[in-house]
A protein has these predicted regions:
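Charged, amphipathic alpha-helical regulatory modules used
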Residues: 1-110, 727-732
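Conformational switch/transducer regions in large eukaryotic molecular machines and scaffolds
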Residues: 14, 681, 711-712
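Amphipathic, well-packed alpha-helical segments that form the structural scaffold of globular domains
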Residues: 23, 467, 471, 522-526
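Conserved catalytic cores of very large enzyme subunits
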Residues: 89-93, 99-510, 531, 535-698, ...
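Metallocofactor- and cofactor-centric catalytic cores in central/energy metabolism, strongly enriched
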Residues: 273-277, 281, 526-527, 722-728
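Contiguous, well-ordered alpha-helical segments that form the cores/surfaces of helical PPI scaffolds
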Residues: 514-527, 547, 708
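Long insertion/accessory domains within large nucleic-acid-processing enzymes
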Residues: 694-733
Length: 733
């Protein structure tokens, strides 16, 4: 049995320490007020039983809470008071040096919580440790100086989650859609070096990856680019090769007609496309940003984003190459082809590619094969997105969607001073998200004690708390100068503001968004209605709650001219934090708080049996009410030999839901070469670990495991809460 120390280190549980602590408190009171030795040992025994009955390692604070409860039960209040006083004094000492232990445990790789905090960061690497160290300082400053005390307390108690406090000390936003078109066509500056318009497709791809790395180092969330911004440079290369081929053959004394020159030039174009796409794939996963990780980058593949004709065919060529290279994968250190985490790919299902007789159906077949093998691409339905948002555009990274462009419609104009702005078109690239605060809906429900009137009252109070926390995020960005991140604010990724100019205008009028996240809709409904939200009564209640969240955002938006938007929070590591806080506040409630995770956003519970099509149809009603971003998924077995089934799901997505993905497994054991599913098992301490079913290997450094984690693919393992959630996922097909 393990415990988690305050520093984050994982240690073996030692009941004797409880006995020693209680004896110390016992000695400080008069003889007639003391516990008997039997009572002291009974306290240790009772606490040990509770700890062993939990399916996770408890923190020191949680164990001390249990000791306090047991002391109070004995009726020996003086002993309990001495124990509580001693604990309080120790807490004051620790607060004098709030970050020391955390940082030291990071450096020595002893911090178990940090090891599993981010499934795409390796905490043993120096650059990651530096980022985490800076993050600890930022969190400390945020906690002590930058946020109101009640918001800090609500965050620490798991009532809300103030996302990314490890970056809040700086004036940084969350995620964005990169205006790569402006940067490439009109030039940019990277690291104080002028970058002019590229003269080939491969050069454009190289510039794009350099820009991606710079952007990632100046924000903390994901970013997205679209291939349609790169594709004009395919024809630039084509024109160059036509001239080169003609010159080369003329110099060699070989006569060639125009048709033959075209054929040879086209062969060179295809090779250049292959090289350019390879640059994107390998640069993205090998570049290291100041965040200590590869950039969280999404590549958008949408044929209808360019006009019909040569340029659309060129875009199809680039998409085909992107899918082929992703299907192949990348080699790990052993030289084995594996699934990379990035870039995330999004493929738009549209009229020209979804039907078997459509012109680009071959790309859809290729996308299906790629998904079956490598978990990507994910899918956006052009038909549904046009109906719901009026335009088709990518999410910013994983799932955060911009609100439809209203600033152009309202005549606000080119406030970003972009060189490619068109007042007759809606603008999405060059826009961003200011940040996220998430409400824990399960806590709202449990706090109401099943009284519906109290539920709605508490929800109103918590929403106002979230509103104030979101305003803190917004106010932190107000007054930010463009000099803080020239690649973003001055050189085209977001804007082309002058040096020393404030970014304030970009925070209003719908140019950027700010997100009210939510989590635990399933558990909330389960507690209030004793039923899943897939039941008729449960669904009605859950939808009312979603409508309430949207009403709040719309009210704030109208009053402040800031685009608040409801967001289906992915909760990578926070799912574990929320579950621990719920267990501490409300105990173990069957089906509600008895797991080490809570369900992301509106999702059907991972253990609930439901077929893929019913799940997507059901969740589509909730996705509409998450305009700030959400994604649905279906869990499927190995589909490499059943691509037709994948295509049938894709076609269902096209007709029924805006944004969805398929989850499968992609693993490799470096000890025995096993490439089936690596399993999750309990070790001797009851901890969930990964094990090769073929050879029994449990060394995470000697296996490659890829699982979908909240929209992205995770490859660096997960905390105990998320690991339990992965283990409990049922197949939907």
């Amino acid at each position: 049995m393990k415990i988690i120390k305050r520093s984050g280190q994982e240690n073996t549980f030692d009941g004797n320490k409880i006995t020693v602590a209680v004896r110390k408190a016992n000695k400080e009171v008069n003889d007639n007020l003391r516990l008997t030795e039997e009572e002291v040992l009974a306290i240790t025994e009772n606490v040990t039983k509770v700890c062993s009955g939990m399916s996770r390692a408890l923190s020191v604070e949680e164990i001390q809470d249990l000791v306090e409860n047991e002391l109070m039960k004995t009726g020996k209040n003086e002993v309990a008071r001495k124990y509580i006083t001693y604990r309080y004094k120790r807490a004051l000492v620790r607060q004098a040096n709030t970050t020391d232990d955390q940082i030291l445990s990071l450096i020595e790789c002893d911090n178990e919580e940090v090891k599993q905090e981010n499934s795409n960061k390796n905490p043993t690497v120096n650059s990651v440790q530096r980022d985490y160290m800076a993050g600890e300082v930022s969190k400390d400053i945020t906690r002590r100086f930058l946020l109101p005390e009640d918001i800090v307390r609500a965050h620490e108690e798991g009532i809300i989650h103030f996302h990314d406090s490890d970056y809040f000390a700086q004036h940084m936003y969350n995620c964005c859609l990169v205006n790569l078109e402006d940067m490439l066509l009109n030039g940019t500056v990277i690291s104080e070096t002028m970058i002019e318009r590229p003269r080939s497709f491969s050069t454009a791809c190289n510039i794009a990856t350099q820009a991606i790395a710079q952007i990632a180092s100046n924000q903390y969330g994901g970013q997205s680019i679209t291939l349609s911004h790169l594709v004009p440079f395919v024809d630039v290369s084509r024109q160059k090769y036509r001239v080169e081929v003609a010159k080369e053959f003329a110099a060699a004394g070989v006569e060639l007609d125009t048709e033959k020159i075209e054929k040879v030039a086209e062969l060179r174009v295809r090779e250049e496309v292959r090289r350019g796409v390879q640059v994107i794939q390998y640069q993205v996963i090998t570049l290291m940003t100041t965040n200590g990780q590869a950039p969280f980058i999404t590549v958008f593949m949408y044929l209808n984003e360019v006009p019909e004709g040569r340029i659309r065919d060129d875009l199809a060529l680039v998409i085909e190459e992107m899918l082929n290279q992703r299907m192949q994968g990348v080699k790990n250190e052993k030289g084995v082809w594996i699934t990379p985490a990035f870039p995330k790919l999004i493929y738009v299902l549209e009229e020209d590619n979804v039907g078997k007789d459509s012109k680009y159906y071959y790309l859809t077949e290729l996308a299906a094969k790629c998904t079956a093998k490598r978990l990507v691409p994910d899918y956006i339905s052009e038909k549904i997105m046009l109906r719901e948002k009026g335009d088709v555009y990518p999410c910013m990274g994983c799932r955060s969607f911009l609100t439809p462009d209203r600033f152009t419609d309202e005549g606000v104009g080119n406030i970003a001073k972009a060189k490619n702005y068109d007042e007759n078109k809606h603008k999405y690239y060059g826009r961003f998200n200011q940040g996220v605060v998430t409400i824990n809906l399960v806590d709202v429900a449990c706090s109401s004690k099943k009284n519906e009137a109290d539920f709605w009252r508490i929800l109103d109070e918590r929403l106002e708390l979230c509103h104030r926390a979101l305003r803190a995020r917004h106010d932190r960005l107000l007054g930010t100068l463009s000099d803080s991140a020239p690649i973003l604010w001055q050189n085209g990724a977001i804007a082309r503001l002058a040096k020393g100019e404030k970014i304030d205008e970009l925070l209003y009028s719908g140019y950027s968004t700010i997100s009210l996240g939510y989590a635990g809709l399933y558990e909330m409904t389960k507690y209030m209605k004793d039923a899943s939200h897939t039941s008729p009564e449960g669904k009605e209640f859950a939808l009312k709650v979603m409508e309430k969240l949207n009403e709040a955002c719309n009210k704030w938006k109208k009053e402040e001219n800031i685009d608040y938007s409801v967001y289906g929070t992915p909760l990578e590591s926070t799912t574990y934090k929320f579950s621990k806080c719920l267990q501490k506040r409300f105990g173990l409630i069957e089906g509600v708080t008895d797991r080490n995770y809570i369900t992301n956003s509106y999702h059907v519970h991972v253990s609930e049996k439901i077929d893929a099509f019913s799940k997507l149809k059901f969740e589509s009603d909730f996705q509409k009410l998450s305009p700030g971003g959400a994604i649905s998924y279906v869990e499927v077995p190995n589909m490499s030999n059943n691509v037709e089934a994948v295509i049938s799901i894709m076609q269902y997505i096209y007709d029924n839901i805006m944004y969805a993905e398929l989850n499968t497994k992609s693993d490799y054991c470096q000890c025995c070469g096993f490439d089936g599913e690596i399993k999750i098992v309990n070790d001797e301490d009851g901890k969930l670990v990964w094990e090769c079913p073929n050879c029994g290997n449990k060394d995470q450094d000697k296996m490659n495991v890829a699982r979908r984690t909240c929209g992205y693919i995770g490859t660096q393992y997960w905390n105990q809460g998320r690991t339990q959630e992965i283990a409990e996922r049922v197949l939907h097909l």
